[in-house]
């Protein structure tokens, strides 16, 4: 088995000698290569990598037109000759000493082995609070928006290994830095394992984190949601929800005109609208991912509806207390309630 260590670089010249030495020590006895994909660094990182190729098994690709970490990794996949690909940064925050553990996980039957900061035994060194908040928030958004990765603790890790078959013939076109998330959604695999590691302190050079990174990440999630069909589901769920409003209002009018008191008539009207919404979501919105009995799904759907109503009520009263107009307060509550109901239904009622 041959291992290809793929390293996208930009202005990492000062780190290469230590990085290559540590990789070499970690992979003693293994057939491996280092594939450096450099975006024409002003500090001539590519040149330093070429110098070190006399000492280590290094293949250097200098890109003068393309830019970006994710596309550099994809180029590395195409140029690599190994059976297993390892992706890592050049800034020494990904410890090369963990690579053998990733490779061992692949040997033991995993298709993808993720170096994880957020499983037991993993951690991040000396990050300020705002960085931790951004990282955890990004992961939470991704896991909610993309059900396929909801059980993965660190789907945005930049340190991972995979069998080459996972990405062979797969069209990858990520936005920004999070190539792993693209692979987890589009790749060909059945088993993923997370290996804990300590995300270290940057040795030298400057962080690549910029303000636009968050925007690119959200664009990437949106694109993956479209690819997965999640945007279509949300649209269908919204249409069904609107039909439920019509059913609710129509039956409320009917029951009141039949002489049922308004205070009582609202109860069967709400229940009929819930049944309407469940029926259409079950045969239309989520028809391809139905699991378990219809009675189990119906019970979970009622729980989601109740949860949404509670959120609507709480948000409404909080905003009223803050002096927000009651119609605006109610609208905000409805929107947040919709989000809660969709998330619960997608991840619980019609979980995949």
Swiss-Prot record:
Pfam families: Glycos_transf_2, GtrA_DPMS_TM
Gene Ontology biological process terms, A to Z: dolichol phosphate mannose biosynthetic process; dolichol-linked oligosaccharide biosynthetic process; GPI anchor biosynthetic process; polysaccharide biosynthetic process; protein O-linked mannosylation
Cytoplasmic domain ranges by topology: 1-229, 287-293, 351-352
Similarity section: Belongs to the glycosyltransferase 2 family.
Names of the cofactor(s): Mg(2+); Mn(2+); Ca(2+)
EC top class, as a word: transferase
Residues noted as binding Mn(2+) in the record, renumbered to the chain: 91, 93
Keyword Nuclease: no
The protein's Enzyme Commission number: 2.4.1.83
Role this protein plays: Transfers mannose from GDP-mannose to dolichol monophosphate to form dolichol phosphate mannose (Dol-P-Man) which is the mannosyl donor in pathways leading to N-glycosylation, glycosyl phosphatidylinositol membrane anchoring, and O-mannosylation of proteins.
Result, substituting residue 91 to A: Decreases enzyme activity
Organism: Pyrococcus furiosus (strain ATCC 43587 / DSM 3638 / JCM 8422 / Vc1)
CC per GO annotation: plasma membrane
Chain sites annotated for binding Mg(2+): 91, 93
Comment on bound cofactor: Binds 1 divalent metal cation.
Protein name: Dolichol-phosphate mannosyltransferase
